[in-house]
């Protein structure tokens, strides 16, 4: 199972390495080389719980054992969402609605950002990396709070969220500024979301900065 950079197919990583690195050195995304070849039997998933579906999908993309995948899913969602089905499908008179607001921050981003920290923690163990992971990310709203809440107090991870001081709502700003967790930080910047994003990308290609962090047993990810 190999992941390749979208900007350089010669850059190849295994799934755990791709999870930990985030972006490739030249700014590309890591994509599964055989994406589309692995088939998922959707009929077998009918009637399955969210947890069972999540585990079935993850088996196609990560190099974890079944036990590790099950643990990731359990720790990501159990007791953290207000509905036992996580994303329940609600029937209306003329259709259906998939509810994506049952997470800890009421944002749809909770679905993915509750799982990512567990994947990160497990990947660190798989590759036997002794460094802690520092997540740097920019937000214009919901992503920041969801990421902070997801990574809150997850072992061997730290997260810092940058947001435009005048570019988020009062509610979103308050959510981030009052975030709990020993490993969470937020920082407002002068500028817009693109400025925050560009600043983070510059840090990721700053070899001296990354070298200094590694001297403190910290590795960047996004």
Residue locations for each model-derived region?
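PLP-dependent amino-acid enzyme catalytic core
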Residues: 1-222
């Amino acid at each position: 199972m190999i992941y390749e950079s979208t900007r350089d197919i010669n850059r190849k990583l295994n799934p755990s390495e791709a999870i930990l690195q985030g972006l490739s050195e030249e700014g590309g995304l890591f994509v599964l080389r055989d994406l589309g070849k692995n088939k998922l039997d959707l009929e077998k998933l009918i009637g399955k719980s969210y947890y069972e579906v999540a585990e079935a999908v993850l088996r196609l993309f990560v190099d974890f054992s079944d036990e590790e995948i099950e643990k990731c899913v359990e720790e990501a969602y159990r007791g953290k969402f207000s509905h036992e089905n996580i994303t329940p499908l609600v029937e209306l008179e003329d259709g259906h609605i998939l509810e994506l607001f049952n997470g800890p921050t009421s944002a749809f981003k909770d679905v993915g950002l509750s799982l990512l920290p567990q994947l990160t923690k497990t990947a660190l163990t798989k590759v036997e990396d002794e460094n802690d992971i520092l997540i740097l990310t920019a937000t214009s709203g919901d992503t920041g709070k969801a990421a902070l809440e997801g990574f809150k107090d997850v072992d061997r991870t730290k997260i810092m969220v940058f947001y435009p001081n005048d570019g988020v709502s009062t509610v979103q700003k308050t959510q981030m500024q009052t975030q709990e967790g020993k490993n969470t930080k937020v920082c407002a910047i002068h500028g817009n979301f693109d400025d925050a994003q560009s600043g983070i990308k510059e840090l990721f290609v700053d070899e001296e900065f990354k070298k200094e962090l590694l001297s403190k047993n910290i590795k960047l990810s996004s």
